[in-house]
């Protein structure tokens, strides 16, 4: 199976939004995070980020099938950490290694060093993936509600 990142275009914003809503719906139901969940974002939120010069959205494809979306924030200044936020895999494509391959490909495109990302502390599989890819937890966490804590990772 060939995994690729395909740069999204302006006309893809609705597709990005719909894929993100579907991909994060289960986590939204589980944690009821109305403030920061990608499942609750609107078109204008994606449009705002899409227009940021440091942001690139990519479709994650497996044999030319769209299986998810990843957003990379890269100021390309050699100082500011690059950021993945968010990465989403459609439910029917999970647990097949697509997120891992997408992160590796993003690092290949944007450079392997000086990254950060965050994930849900309570989602052990997400934390395992970050650590498997060489990211280490920082001391920073953010409690969103009584069910959900965000943990932050970096990779040098």
Predicted regions and their residues:
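Conserved acetyl-CoA-binding loop-helix of GNAT-fold acetyltransferases
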Residues: 86-89, 95-108, 128, 132
């Amino acid at each position: 199976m060939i995994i690729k990142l395909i740069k999204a275009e302006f006309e893809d914003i609705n597709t990005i939004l719909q894929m993100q809503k579907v991909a994060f719906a289960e986590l939204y139901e589980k944690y009821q995070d109305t403030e920061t969940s990608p499942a609750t974002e609107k078109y204008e939120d994606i449009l705002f980020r899409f227009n940021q010069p440091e942001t690139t959205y990519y479709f994650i494809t497996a044999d030319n099938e769209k299986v998810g979306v990843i957003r990379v924030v890269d100021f390309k200044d050699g100082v500011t950490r690059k950021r993945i936020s968010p990465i989403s895999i459609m439910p029917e494509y999970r647990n097949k290694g697509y997120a891992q391959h997408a992160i590796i490909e993003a690092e290949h495109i944007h450079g392997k060093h000086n990254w950060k990302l965050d994930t849900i502390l309570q989602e052990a599989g997400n934390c395992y993936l970050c650590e498997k890819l060489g990211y280490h937890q920082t001391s920073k966490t953010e409690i969103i509600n009584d069910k959900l804590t965000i943990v932050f990772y970096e990779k040098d």
